[in-house]
């Protein structure tokens, strides 16, 4: 039996070596490995058969022969595996090669949001007219949002259904999310008494309203010009120049309508002719009310000025034919791909 086992081992070696050499893929090689070196393989079966041999010397000799064969097959399989892996890599390199002469795929880049584009453009137009852009806090006290702007306590704009009021942990003074950036004008006039004062204040404003033409948060840019002998004619020239530049139409039809704002007197709303068939309101303006000057410590008998407020979303909707105000804030990539601008458009 021992002689038969030894003959089986020697014949097995030739067969195993042949199968290893003829394996054409890593999958075939793995099958060969399992059949000879696996837990249920032939080599394991030979070791199990050694238990039946009582002669310790013969058992040891046969065990050494089986060990030598196992190590040899293990090394042959490892070498063959390296060869097959190298062949696989070479095959992929030849068949999946990249043609470096082909143009690269364009990278996906972001776009400038229409509101950012409009804010930048509006600031630039007014900068050319000598207006400096200034910022102010979004959370304000009632004085800077209402009282200083000659807005009495009974005015509808101060009602809770129109304005977001905040709790003030420091004192009993109510705070609000500003309903316009006119509060920046008040802060500017409080801080500086060097004339002329010529500023625009872009920023977010908040009102308790939400539909196709209103959102709880939107953007305004408000302007202020204070000096001696400022008049309505200068205001009209400023507005005409801005609208003509922004819409790129020197023949744009513009009209001023009498209106009322508590912080200006006289006051006007400005419309433009839209598609030649109707008038669309684009901004409000007027001469600064004397009470506003008194509230910030400016002599209204010596100085006067004009102010205006422009809705950024309204300008963007008109210029870029956007029908729903809410789409500005939906965060849809497809929408931004369509309406967005390349960064080079920012001047």
From Swiss-Prot:
- Cross-referenced InterPro entries: aa-tRNA-synth_II, aa-tRNA-synth_II/BPL/LPL, Phe-tRNA-synth_IIc_asu, Phe-tRNA_ligase_II_N, Phe_tRNA_ligase_alpha1_bac, Phenylalanyl-tRNA_Synthase, tRNA-bd_arm
Signal peptide, first to last residue: none
Q: Subunit arrangement? A: Tetramer of two alpha and two beta subunits.
Instruction: Provide a GO biological process annotation.
Output: phenylalanyl-tRNA aminoacylation
Catalytic activity, as annotated: tRNA(Phe) + L-phenylalanine + ATP = L-phenylalanyl-tRNA(Phe) + AMP + diphosphate + H(+)
Query: Record's Gene Ontology CC terms?
Result: cytoplasm
Q: Which PROSITE patterns match?
A: AA_TRNA_LIGASE_II
Gene3D superfamilies named in the record? Bira Bifunctional Protein, Domain 2 (3.30.930.10)
Its annotated compartments are: Cytoplasm
Which keywords are on file for this protein?
A: Aminoacyl-tRNA synthetase, ATP-binding, Cytoplasm, Ligase, Magnesium, Metal-binding, Nucleotide-binding, Protein biosynthesis
Q: Which Pfam families match?
A: Phe_tRNA-synt_N, tRNA-synt_2d
Listed cofactors: Mg(2+)
User: What protein family is recorded?
Assistant: Belongs to the class-II aminoacyl-tRNA synthetase family. Phe-tRNA synthetase alpha subunit type 1 subfamily.
Q: Which GO terms describe its molecular function?
A: ATP binding; magnesium ion binding; phenylalanine-tRNA ligase activity; tRNA binding
Name by which UniProt lists this protein = Phenylalanine--tRNA ligase alpha subunit
* Cofactor binding note from Swiss-Prot or TrEMBL: Binds 2 magnesium ions per tetramer.
Record-listed E.C. numbers: 6.1.1.20
Enzyme class of the recorded protein, top EC level: ligase
Highest taxon above the source species: Bacteria
User: Which residues does the record give as Mg(2+) binding sites?
Assistant: 265
